[in-house]
Amino acid sequence: MAEPQKSSKVAIKKMEDDLPPPPIPDSIQVIAPASQDPNPLPVPPPKQAFSKFYQQRQVNELKRLYRHMHPELRKNLEEAVTEDLAEMLNTEDPNAQGSVNLDKVLPGEVQSMRWIFENWALDSIGDHQATKKMMEDEIIPGGDVKSTSLRFENQSVNGDYLSTTAKVSETDLARGDVHTARWLFETQPLDSLNKLYSDETEMQEAVLKEPVQGGDVKGAKELFEAQSLDAIGRCCSVEEKSILQLKSEIQELKGDVKKTIRLFQTEPLCAIRDKTGNIHEIKSVCREEIQSNAVRTARWLFETQPLDTINKDTSKVQIIRGISLEEIGRPDVSGARWIFETQPLDAIREITVEEQDFKASTDFVTGADVTKQRLLFGTQALDSLKGEASESVAAKEQVIGGDVKSTLWLFETQPMETLKDNVEVGHLKKVELSAEEKGDVKQRKHVFETCPLGSISKAFEEEISAASTEEVVKGDVKSFKTLFETLPLDSIKEVDAEPITKEEEKIPPGNVKANQILFETTPLYAIKDSFGNFHEVTSVSREQVISGDVKKYKWMFETRPLDQFDESTKKVDIIRGITKQEVVAGDVRTAKWLFETQPMDVIHHQATQGEEHPSMKREISQRGDVKTCRWLFETQPMHTLYEKAEKKQEEDVSVPQADVKSYTWMFETQPLDSLKGQEEQYLRVSKAYSQDELQGVDVKTVRHLFETEPLGSSVVSEADQKKTLRYSSRVEIQSGEVSRVKEFFEAKPLDTTTKPTAVIKDDGTIEAGSVHKFTWLFENYPMDTLKDSSEGIQEIPPEKDIKGGDVGGKRFIFETYSLDQIHDKVDETELHKIQKDTMSKANVKSCTMLFESQPLYAIQDKEGGYHEVTSVQKEEIMKGDVKGARWLFETKPLDQIKKEEEVFVIRAVTQEDIKKGDVQAARWRFETEPLDSFPGGKISVPRTVDDVQKGDVQSNKQLFESQQVGQKKYVRMVSVSDVQRGDVRTSTWLFENQPVDSLYGDADRSSSISTVQREDSQKGDVKRCTWLFETQPMDTLKDPEVTVSTGTQEPIPRADVKSTTWLFESTPLDKFSASECSRETELKERTMRETLETLCTCQAIQHDGILIEANDTESVKMVKYQLSSPGAPEILKEEIVRGHLQGIMLQLLHRTNVEPQSVLVEEDREGKIKVSSLQLLDQSEAIKGKEDLSGNVAKALQSLLSQDASIKKGMVIQETKSESVKMTLYSLLFHSVQQKVVKGDVKSTIGNLMASSQEQRATVTVKREDNEKGNVQLFASCIEKGDLDYLKNLQQESEIQSLISAQAEQGAAESAPRALQSTNTHVLANKEQVEKVMAEAKSGALEGAKMVFACESTGKEGALEREVVHAVGVTGTTVQCLGKPQNLPTGMEKEEIMSGGLKVTTKSIQRVADVSKNTEKEESISACLKEPKATMQGIAQAKVTAERNEVVGEQQSLVTEQASQKQSEEKVLGNDLQAAMQSLRLATAEARNIQHHVQSKLQRNREEVHMACRQQVASKQETKTLQSTIHQQESASTMRENTSTAIRTSTTRVQEASRTHTSVSQKSIASHKKVSASEEVQGGQLLSQENQVVPSRDVSIKDGLYTATPVKTYINPFVESDYKEQSVQEERDVIIRGDVQTAIRALQSAATEQRLVEKEDIVRGNLKATLQSLEKSNVNVSKGDFKAAMIYRNAGQSYSVCKKKSETQVNNNQTAVVASGSQADNDFPPPPPVAVMKAEHCPPSTKATREGAPPLLTSKDEAPGCFSPLQTPLPPPPSLSCKPSDQNSTEKPKIPPKPEITAPLRKKPVPPPKPEHLLHEAYSASTNNSTNRSTKSVPPPVPPKPPGLREISMPKPPPAELQLSCTEVCEQSDHRESQDKCCTLESSMDKSITVHGPERKLPKYTAKTPLQMAEERYKARKGGQGKFELDRAKPSKPVKNGEVG
């Protein structure tokens, strides 16, 4: 055993590798014990097995655990485990031996088994309890056994379930119930298994092990391989026939889909066990088989009732364990057997069943054919059974006659065609071998066919016991099989049915087709008419009407002339008569209807008089040239007519049981004269025999069973008897083919229909209600061709190919021509809502309109019946130059009209053409009149008179079966109005039906249209023609009765007729635009005004703009409005334009000046209006282009713009003061106004919405799709790594972040200040508030946002400042406000979220606070800045210190703010934050020193440039703000760092980096787009406009937020969405930063004066430039890798942010001052873009540089050049920014770089060491940024975004180390160390910083000098000097690299 186990271990390993069948038998053996324990099963009986069973279980458990072990660990444990297992198993030698033997004996089989069990979930191995449970709660679900078992056989994935089933089987096996196990495998729904044993993982332990004996294992294996599950165990496999007795069968053939429903009754008492172990007796079984060309499905339904007590011998109760389908492929017949796995009830109770009985499973049938291999009855393959069924039975169990238990139940399904129709017998009796074998098989069969099961079972012993079962050898399964297989069912009838039986037996028995004794076996049935012609019967339908005691039968034979008999192929049976046999068995009576047929050669007419004279009526309907005759044959049984009471008694009581009464009606041929034209022909009954008479009559006929019906229903209850019941059944004999449709309509009480009695018409016609569908074809003719024949709405006769029963509907046609000349404007009373399908076929344009249910539109047919119009198809027909229209109305009969329903009768169709410009629309009006307005009821029953004598089938309106020509008594009057207006002529046809007799006084004379009177009345330019169509009998055609009809028509009061006109627009859908009538437009006008007002009231509209509202599918209503006064929009212009709202929105989204954030105004059903912000546009997405708009935009479009009749949806495009386009989407209830859709990316809008719903982050708009995409990868990686917790955190964080970032980014993009405000608001307020704030912010007013904020708080500014201050003061508060971020955060999440949300939010809040403080300060400062830049510089120096500490302080007199922010930062950071803060402070000290130096320079520069560029100062402030934001972020990250110092450090760095990145991105954007430059300029302007400064600051904050997004970058690696978010955000940041610099300045100024939302305009311009530069820099972004794009965006953002900072710094720097002077003014100019571009382009080199020091130098030179200019203004922060960008781009995954950046920021004071590190890091960062942009490496950009997340997700030591190292580097740790720790990222960051620093002050502060130099260069470039500076910067960069190196 040890060895086997060993091998089993190996096998297990293998199993893990490939679950499929393990090759090693030993392993199999082991597994078998483990999973299935097949070894134990075979050897020991279940009882014995149990003791060992538990040991086995332990072994299994051990094995299960073993499987879960790591392969390495397993190696170590292998020997010990093997030994232990060997010991355990050896204790039970038999088992061990069995398993070993198993391996040896059935290696292949065992392997199969093992393979199956191996596939179980590892943890599902081995639980004793599970097994026990299974035993206790056994469920016997029904269902598709085959597919279920196939599932088990083929699926390895569902191992768990298998194991469960195995377990169950084991338990059962323990009971000796192997079959049960098999059943479980086959039939137990997987989910039920799962539920039952969801907690039991050790199911693997297959209880089978012990109970299964050696032979059984083989069976089990076979089961899985190829044999029916019953092969496994103790279940007897029984064929369906033996268990189930067919009660009834319904076959439907529709097209090529055949549906067969069989209702069975279980013969031996069968039961099913449910999960709880309760046993339910199966009352009936239904199998539904649907067979189409390729697919065949079967469903078993069991009807059960609880079996509380089993009165019968338990040995007779079979528990059905499973059902399996065995298909035996035969060349000609596909035989399928349903095999039931049954188990004697008593066997279940016995734990041990003689396993010998099941050992037959050892007969393993080898063979590749799975179906053959499948063991029948658990042990034998079907093919072995076929010849030797008895042997197999013997092998299995001695079959004792009558012993149901051992009976072989063989149920083979033959192709459905081969089953005789009489299988549909009313009640089938089960064959109980025990009792029934004594009976006559034939008799039994008959019973099956004709008796209800219940009656058979009760009466069997009495009635049928007499029959001799000698034919069937008792216990001989073979004979039974023969019985069921070969004997036609009808040949097994009761003795009483002998006549039938004999006749039916003429069909050769044994032939499978014998079962189809119906019309199929004798394919051709004919009826001979009096002419001697034969008519082939195509379908037979019988209708039985029971009204009270009277039964009437109506037989309708549909025939077609049989021109010649093809005797070679068919034998023609002439239907001579119909026999009704009433068979009574027990208390159940069944009637069988048989056709008496005579072969052609034996036709003699037995014309004897019948007491009854049912007649066969013939209807001939001419379809084309084929005459179809319908022969109607009605019976009225004598006894029901004359001896009702007696007969009733007889039927009830005196009819002897099993007595068969038969009545035969023989038809006689009718004299020729009896056949009248087209009337139905009645077959006259020559003689009606009763049974007794029949005996003596020499009728040589073959009887074919048409159908059986239970007679019990006639005696059921008196109440029922009073009702009129109608049974109708129909068999279609389709040219003798097997495929037929047999539809039975049973026992539908007529009272359920409107007219119970209407069903029985004397003439036998089908009543109107029974025809299901009418198509109303309105045939129209050109006006000039209007003839008598055209009745306007004409009913089209059924098409030739429509079969009688299929004639679904009437079709009415209405045609008009010269559409182009028919114009009229008629007020539509009602606009019919229709759905149009426009199709063009050649010259026929067809448009189908589906009518809605209310009101009902009806069309009257000739008989006056109303048909509900379900759809109208309009075809425009071009004939030459004449345009015609044809209306085809599809209808369904309108059986009953409820009072509450409005029914409009369509009288005519009117068309009017409308021309608007070059759009021509045709309007179709249906002239209707309410049904109730018909006078008196005359018109309500009009029958149109129309026998248009044309050969054309359409125009020759042949009466449908039930319509009689003679009944046409109505004239249709058409009134045509021709209205000529200019060149427009409209003709209106009014068709009215008047009873002819109302016109003539004689209804009989009307047979055809006689005249058309046209009355022209000209009034002015209106000419009215009245056409009167009158009908007269053909013979009276010449008598002109026109006047009468005219007179009649004229008086018809027009007022009485409510005319409802349905307006159908015929314009092609794509041109369906201005076709609405003016009235509608007015309505919409009102609606539009309401919409505008509503939107104004909810403050969604704050600027002038355009409101576009979805009008219909193809047009939109556009209203240009202007806000003359708040809340009072004035509509300047309104028009309907063709187009899709969605298309318009998408187009708008692609415009550059669209604000990313839009407002979503929704009105719920209660009328509450909810305003939320929606991120329409990712800034990054804007670059990405259309393909990225798909996801969120699509969702937004669908949700917002999907049409809803009750909802007004649309968008408002407002032009804000900043000239950006703001989109407001609205969805209002009909009374409410549409939302205005702010232009923007719908995706981003959606993202924004989502973001607003969650916390707003100043991150990029979350792209839903990107998020998801990213998440997929991230999740995949997480899953691969097994980091599920992270995944969860990530998920939450990423969602929040993405939302926040989406919002933040949107906000930033739209207006950083607003975003900040909204973010703050969001943080402070709840989501709705945030949404409001966002919406307001979006609305384009920072002020508005502030106002919202104020509303939520106190004063706008006060509240905002407060909140900001609050945020600054209490980062925790901010975090709290953020809430989710704070909670999520703790460590990793916090960082992520915080970086994304908290950091960003905190930073943004802090920034806002700073901004507000700065705003206040900047208001003063901006004054100071503007005026005393020196002050600014001083402040800036202070700020530098503050920035180093916390950039927050910068603008806040920078120092104060710094302190507060520092405090908040520290608070937020906590201890870790403090540590981070300390490092930050060190960095800050360095940074301050550097900053002081730089600021001194900058101050000089600023002083110099101050005049030149206050804006630059502002930008500097922005930069500082950014820095402060970064610092805040650092603090936030520090806070997050609380989780881990390393992480914190990295977070701080990341935050710094992200901030730096933001700065860099901004700078990059600025340089790329020159937007940063322009933004700087704008920012300067904004600074000048202190208000703007606040916005700039906000932008900085946003940058910070974006930086947070970069921080997120770390998360991004895992979460692509984060990645994407970050990248998107960063790109947005970049864009925004292009803008953002300006925006930052604007935000700063906005912070100062958040009211200055207008700065957004600047942001917008910058956005464009930024986007352009981003596009340039991030070429890949547009190229398509979203990730790459995101990365690039992020990189770009960081880069541009850094750049912005650098630029700002450059402005501050003296050199920068000059550059900034020119740059600030020329920020937009190419120089900055060049620098940025350079930096961005540098990325590749930078990347290389990052990767290698020398390359870094080179790229550094470039990238730093770019970065340094950007960074120069804020040397350290820019460096940081650069770093973050680089890191984001290159090492986004690594948070460390960002922390490094942060450290560099702090380090700024420490010049030399930090510069090196900074240079390295900064350079690498810049390189990264550049590289990211160039490379489009999503990961880098993302890092900035999710630093926190990243740290968390990356919480990887590396990030932390990197962060620490970065911090250390910042702290002057060895730069190389930092680089090493930070990896290239840090180096890049350091380098970037260093570059920037060195540029500024290479000697003093490397970082400063490089940055300064870079910035100066950048500015010089911008101004023209930038190039020189860049050159300088490049050199310094190399120096930096050298230093770094």
Swiss-Prot record:
Keywords: Actin-binding, Cell junction, Developmental protein, Repeat. Pfam families: Xin. The keyword Transmembrane helix does not apply. Residues 1834-1843 have a biased composition (Pro residues). GO terms for molecular function: actin filament binding. Xin repeats bind F-actin. The lineage of its organism: Eukaryota, Metazoa, Chordata, Craniata, Vertebrata. Residues 1820-1833 have a biased composition (Low complexity). Expressed at intercalated disks in the heart (at protein level). Coiled coil: none annotated. Residues 1514-1565 have a biased composition (Polar residues). It is found in: Cell junction, Adherens junction; Cell junction, Desmosome. This is Xin actin-binding repeat-containing protein 1. Residues 1-41, 1514-1568, 1715-1856, 1914-1941 are annotated as: Disordered. GO terms for cellular component: adherens junction; desmosome; intercalated disc. The keyword rRNA-binding does not apply.
